[in-house]
Structures are given as C-alpha cells and as structure tokens.
C-alpha cells in the first residue's frame, strides 16, 4: 500500500466561522493557525495547503490576560531612518481590531509562499457581520 500524499486537486476545503467575543488572543490564534494549515485533517501534507477557510467575527472583543492591554506594543517600520512606529494593544484595538488577530495568526504560520497562501484564507471582521453567507460556514466553537 502506498503512502497517501495530498495534491492541490484532491484537497477539499470547508468554511468555518469563529466568534472571538471574550476569547483570549493566543488561544484562539493557535487554533485558527492549526486549521489554516490543515493539521487537524488526516490527509495533512506539509508541502500542500490542505487547510480550511476561517472567518473571525467580533475581533474587537478579543481579550488578553494580565496587563498586556496596556503593556503589549506592536511595532512597524517604514524602512527609512527613524521610521519606527509603535502602538499599544488598546489603541490598535480601538482603531483596527482586525489587525490584532491577523498579526497573531500570521506569526504562527510558515514563512514563505505556502504560508502566505494559508494566510489568505483568513477573513477577520471587527463586528458580528460578515459577507460570506453564500459559503454556508459552519460554526466552530473554540
């Protein structure tokens, strides 16, 4: 019997919706990253994108433990001298709450073209509404 190896043509992808209301950032991000990679499936193959599509709603209501709301800092750099910018978790949650979950999940995915393809299957929304009803997503309880 031959070892099964998934190919891009044989992969079946499902759509799941995750409610981030009151959930801890790291715990929800690890489960999302695992499902984007496809490691929960028996046909997982490391060099093939076997993961599912994940829709995250209520990103503005995600929580962090301890005093990380004030102490956690996100950095970005323009590439020019003196071009570093920083923003706290609280301010980022007020302005762009989707970015918090996106950055947490992106850091848990592989680096390179395959990781970027996996990341494209993540859809994050600040509120409770999303525009993927046509895909009939299943509710995923994390």
Curated annotation (Swiss-Prot):
PANTHER family: LARGE RIBOSOMAL SUBUNIT PROTEIN UL13M, RIBOSOMAL PROTEIN L13. This protein is one of the early assembly proteins of the 50S ribosomal subunit, although it is not seen to bind rRNA by itself. It is important during the early stages of 50S assembly. GO terms for molecular function: mRNA binding; structural constituent of ribosome. GO terms for biological process: negative regulation of translation; translation. It comes from Shewanella oneidensis (strain ATCC 700550 / JCM 31522 / CIP 106686 / LMG 19005 / NCIMB 14063 / MR-1). One of its GO terms (cellular component) is cytosolic large ribosomal subunit. Signal peptide: none annotated. It comes from the Bacteria. InterPro entries: Ribosomal_uL13 (IPR005822), Ribosomal_uL13_bac-type (IPR005823), Ribosomal_uL13_CS (IPR023563), Ribosomal_uL13_sf (IPR036899). It holds the Pfam family Ribosomal_L13. This is Large ribosomal subunit protein uL13. The gene is rplM. Belongs to the universal ribosomal protein uL13 family. Keywords: Ribonucleoprotein, Ribosomal protein. Gene3D superfamilies: Ribosomal protein L13 (3.90.1180.10). Part of the 50S ribosomal subunit. PROSITE patterns: RIBOSOMAL_L13.
